[in-house]
Regions:
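Cytoplasmic helix-loop-helix junction between adjacent transmembrane helices
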Residues: 96-134, 329
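Flexible cytoplasmic inter-helical loops of multi-pass small-molecule transporters
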Residues: 176-195, 392-397
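Helix-loop-helix hairpin linking two adjacent transmembrane segments in secondary transporters
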Residues: 132-179
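Extracytoplasmic gate region of multi-pass secondary transporters
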Residues: 20-24, 203-265
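Hydrophobic core of transmembrane alpha-helices in multi-pass small-molecule transporters
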Residues: 11, 91-107, 214, 301-315
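C-terminal transmembrane helical hairpin of 12-TM major facilitator-type secondary transporters
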Residues: 246, 252-258, 263-323
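Conserved MFS/SLC helix-loop-helix module at the cytosolic interface between two early adjacent transmembrane helices
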Residues: 51-90, 269
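Residue-level signature of mid-helix packing/kink "hotspots" within the transmembrane helices
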Residues: 18, 46-54, 141, 255-263, ...
Length: 397
């Protein structure tokens, strides 16, 4: 039950957000805004998500995830409705940035992984996290064509309202993820939240993980938000890649192959050193982006790139969270996963915002693509020395 409804929760939350890039041009064109405006809203959404995630995680660890997820589902629906009816930048940013950013802290991986960590045996934990991540990937694959269909049939405003109704399904889903009190009474002595935080931030491997996770956020959010307009811009020279169908198919392929990638990373993470798998993922991304820029653009090259990136897309999540659980145990897993996730969201903010900012000033995304490549090599290096051993305090967790 936990795997099924936890997977459904991230299917809805991650699936809806994965399609936001499709709304970039329709919304900015209709309102006469620059791409920087939409990019800033999504960037703030990711930053708020990351900044508040440790707090939401601590509340979920302390009081139970169910209440947190119900509130998150309500905020998600309100945020989408607010995006639909907003006609000025401030209201749009509050709805899409603040409300949905807060909602995602309560409905995505960190909270669900906390539930799994407390209720799944340690020898199956990373596998279960891979299953949950694969469910989120399925949501991305499912929702991209659905959101494009809503856009084409009803326009951006009505499409967002319908997505808001869909987001409200997260509230009854949360009801099925209620935990018994026994799940929170884990044997970790009398360690407090403050002590757990101090223990984590002083751990070199935890710091290296957070650096690598910054890169993950930068790359995936830049591509999710700016791939569609990037392909549209290429249409003047390469008309075949500018069709909305190409961008929709590419984003759907990312979601499809992400299913296999996240499941595979969870499976392999039970059998091989997770740090080496993480390093390989980041290096693979750098190579894939480099090849995408060097090969003449075409629908086929775009689909191949999307498939490779999809396989590597969120495969970092079960591995990173698995290492955190392995080192520190599961009592404060939601909070500590949220803390390392904050670094991911700082990267997301930079990827989303820099994409729009530098495009509006240079007329090109090339510089941001090059940054994404360099960061991939950096993350490959910093994950290699991570130590996966449990610290003495939580050796039996």
């Amino acid at each position: 039950q936990i795997l099924i409804f936890g997977g459904l929760m991230v299917t809805l939350s991650m699936g809806i957000r994965h399609g936001f890039g499709l709304f970039n041009l329709p919304i900015t064109t209709a309102n006469g805004w620059g791409r920087e405006t939409f990019a800033l809203t999504i960037a703030l959404q990711n930053l708020i998500w990351g900044a508040v995630q440790p707090i939401t995680g601590a509340l979920a660890d302390r009081y139970g995830a169910f209440k947190i997820m119900v509130i998150g589902g309500a905020l998600y629906a309100l945020g989408l409705a607010g995006m639909a009816i907003s006609t000025d930048v401030l209201n749009f940013t509050i709805a899409g940035g603040l409300l949905i950013g807060l909602a995602q802290t309560a409905t995505t991986y960190s909270v669900v992984y906390g539930i799994l960590g407390r209720n799944v045996p340690a020898d199956k934990r990373v596998w279960a996290m891979g299953i949950a991540a694969a469910a989120g990937s399925f949501g991305q694959f499912l929702m991209i064509p659905a959101e494009q269909g809503l856009l084409s049939s009803f326009g951006a405003q009505n499409a967002l309202l319908l997505l808001g109704l869909m987001a409200s399904l997260m509230m009854p889903t949360a009801w099925m993820l209620r935990e018994g009190k026994v799940n929170h009474n884990l044997n970790l002595g009398d360690q407090t939240i403050k002590e757990a935080l101090k223990e984590a931030v002083s751990n070199p491997s935890f710091r290296l993980l957070t650096l690598g996770y910054f890169v993950c956020g930068f790359q995936v959010v830049f591509i999710a938000v700016h791939l569609a307009p990037y392909l549209k811009d290429l249409s003047s020279t390469f008309p075949a890649v500018g069709s909305p169908a190409v961008a929709t198919t590419a984003l759907a392929l990312i979601g499809l192959f992400n299913i296999f990638g996240t499941y595979s990373s969870g499976y392999l993470g039970q059998r091989f050193p997770k740090r080496f798998l993480l390093s390989g993922i980041y290096l693979g991304r750098a190579i894939a982006i480099s090849a995408f820029l060097l090969i003449p653009p075409s629908p086929i090259s775009t689909y191949v790139f999307a498939s490779i990136m999809g396989f590597l897309w969120l495969s970092t999540i079960p591995l990173t969270n698995g290492i955190v659980a392995q080192i520190f145990g599961v009592k404060y897993l939601t909070m500590l996963s949220g803390l390392v996730f904050f670094s991911h969201q700082l990267g997301s903010f930079c990827g989303a915002f820099l994409g729009g900012y530098l495009f509006d000033r240079t007329g090109s995304y090339l510089i941001v693509w090059q940054i994404a490549i360099a960061l991939g090599v950096f993350a490959f290096i910093v994950n290699l020395p991570v130590k996966e051993r449990a610290i003495t305090r939580v050796a039996n967790a």
